Amino acid sequence: MLVLSGGTGTPKLLQGLKEVADFWVVVNTAEDVWVSGNKICPDIDSVIYAIAEVIDDEKWWGIKGDTFHTHERLKELGFDEGMRIGDLDRATHILRSEMLRAGKSLCEATKAVAEAYGVKQEIFPMCEEEVSTTVVTDEGEMHFQEFWVLRRGEPEVKDVYFRGIEKARIPDEVKERLRKEKEVLIGPSNPITSILPILSVEDFRERLRDKKVIAISPIVGEKAVSGPAGKLMRAKGYEVSARGVADVYADFLDLLVVDEADKGVMERSVATNTIMKTKEDAVRLAEFVVKLFDGL
């Protein structure tokens, strides 16, 4: 099974899915950013940390028990990184960045990082090229990290686009596996900033039309479970609801998993408890989805 993932929602699910199914992951890289000379791939790192079970499961980013000595020391020296980067997390960024500077691809660097953390599943970036999710606000354009991390999602959003997406290509390693894959699960990540960038790489969306595709809605009622998904969906003209999520994936989606609160809101949907507060919740949801694929 192929799983499409961003940095929130889906990593929780993957902790459960690894107990019940074999899978590989293609991860959004449109939120990647260079900080202090190192390439940060927040969504890839969250996926790896979650599967390795070292993720800070209170914030759902970074590493559990991390310290921030380097970040704080830089601040004392008069340099503000903008993002609060943990010391252990920074080691991941350094490993990746040194490999990239040595001429390795992002796919190769991601494989090395995953293996270093003991992750057996294959994790791939959506592309090798630099793509940046850009949020058009009432205060001007800003990188998604600036909008969400520095500004806490406060500015009014007018539009969202992916700078550089026209040059992005599906990695050969992903093309080969995708050609053979029959089942695709779109995790409960932000449809606009986590999943849409992946679907916008070359002809990725078209390649899903002959697959069995199930998506899990990150919207319950009219609210996002976490993050700014609602605000961003409205900006792109989608209804903030499970139906709006289905509309984003309309041309290839076979079935949408919605929360029990949204039971019966639309055809081609099935309801269960989609809120994952514990690993047991994640295992239960993963088992539910795996059985759905068997019935498609």
Curated annotation (Swiss-Prot):
Q: Annotated Gene Ontology MF terms?
A: LPPG:FO 2-phospho-L-lactate transferase activity; magnesium ion binding
* Amino-acid positions noted as binding 7,8-didemethyl-8-hydroxy-5-deazariboflavin in the UniProt annotation, renumbered to this chain: D45, R84
Summary of the function given for this chain in its UniProt record: Catalyzes the transfer of the 2-phospholactate moiety from (2S)-lactyl-2-diphospho-5'-guanosine to 7,8-didemethyl-8-hydroxy-5-deazariboflavin (FO) with the formation of oxidized coenzyme F420-0 and GMP.
Family the UniProt entry places it in: Belongs to the CofD family.
Record pathway: Cofactor biosynthesis; coenzyme F420 biosynthesis
Q: Which cofactor does it need?
A: Mg(2+)
* UniProt-listed Enzyme Commission number(s): 2.7.8.28
Name the UniProt record assigns to this protein: 2-phospho-L-lactate transferase
Pfam families under this entry?
A: CofD (PF01933)
Q: Recite the UniProt keywords alphabetically.
A: Magnesium, Transferase
Provide the GO biological process annotations. F420-0 metabolic process
Q: Self-association or partners: how does it assemble?
A: Homodimer.
Q: Which reaction does it catalyse?
A: (2S)-lactyl-2-diphospho-5'-guanosine + 7,8-didemethyl-8-hydroxy-5-deazariboflavin = oxidized coenzyme F420-0 + GMP + H(+)
Q: Which Gene3D superfamilies match?
A: CofD-like domain (1.10.8.240), CofD-like domains (3.40.50.10680)
Q: Which HAMAP family match?
A: CofD
Source species, please? Archaeoglobus fulgidus (strain ATCC 49558 / DSM 4304 / JCM 9628 / NBRC 100126 / VC-16)
Superkingdom of source: Archaea
Give the matching SUPFAM superfamilies.
Answer: CofD-like
